[in-house]
């Protein structure tokens, strides 16, 4: 979310910078946990959790079981859908764990609390990379182990270069690291969308 200001003092709020272009002379991020007061003409933080500061939580005890249950619940909540859905599987630890949890719940409908069979009981997983990339092999290994319908999307360097203009337009940054990470995801998202999977 962004907030922008024009020379006449009008305040604009938009979810994309593109919407403020041509209207505002200056703009800035509308930070989470803040509100804007037109009377005071400034942003004020209203929401702050104690765990925002490491010192406040550094001595907390952690329960492996509580973390396990919270992670499973968080993934399960996201699986309510009336359309086919899939997971992005890089082969790394995070995506592998999340994909395995999603696969665990894929055969039954979350909406019926597991009482009904899912309309599409096979979870699709997706990986993207240049041909021969080691991440693709790791993703395939995980997909085979957890039993997803796996789709490996290969792209060429030229396809990546051709997509950069669109990627920059959508992510609204020229940051090299962000563009480099977003380009394969953009190409992958186009394929997933064309398959009718969310």
How would you describe each model-predicted region?
Residues 179, 187-198:
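Active-site adenylate/phosphate-handling loop in enzymes that bind or generate adenylated species
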Residues 1-174, 185:
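Cysteine-centered catalytic environments shared across enzyme families
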Residues 175-181:
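Short, flexible loop segments at the rims of nucleotide/cofactor-binding pockets, characterized by
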């Amino acid at each position: 979310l962004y907030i922008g200001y024009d020379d006449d003092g009008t305040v604009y709020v938009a979810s994309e910078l593109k919407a403020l272009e041509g209207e505002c002379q200056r703009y800035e991020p509308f930070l989470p946990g803040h509100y804007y007061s037109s009377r005071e003409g400034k942003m004020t933080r209203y929401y702050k959790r104690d765990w925002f500061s490491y010192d406040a939580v550094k001595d907390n005890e952690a329960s492996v079981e509580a973390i396990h249950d919270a992670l499973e619940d968080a993934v399960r909540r996201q699986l309510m859908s009336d359309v086919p859905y899939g997971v992005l599987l890089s082969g790394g630890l995070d995506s592998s764990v999340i994909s395995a949890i999603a696969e665990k719940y894929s055969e039954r409908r979350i909406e019926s609390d597991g009482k009904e069979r899912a309309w599409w009981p096979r979870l699709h997983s997706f990986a993207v990379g240049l041909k021969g990339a080691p991440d693709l092999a790791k993703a395939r290994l995980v997909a085979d182990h957890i039993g997803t319908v796996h789709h490996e999307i290969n792209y060429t360097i030229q396809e990546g270069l051709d997509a950069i203009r669109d990627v920059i337009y959508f992510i609204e940054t020229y940051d090299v690291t962000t563009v480099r990470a977003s380009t394969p995801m953009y190409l992958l998202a186009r394929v997933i969308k064309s398959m009718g999977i969310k």
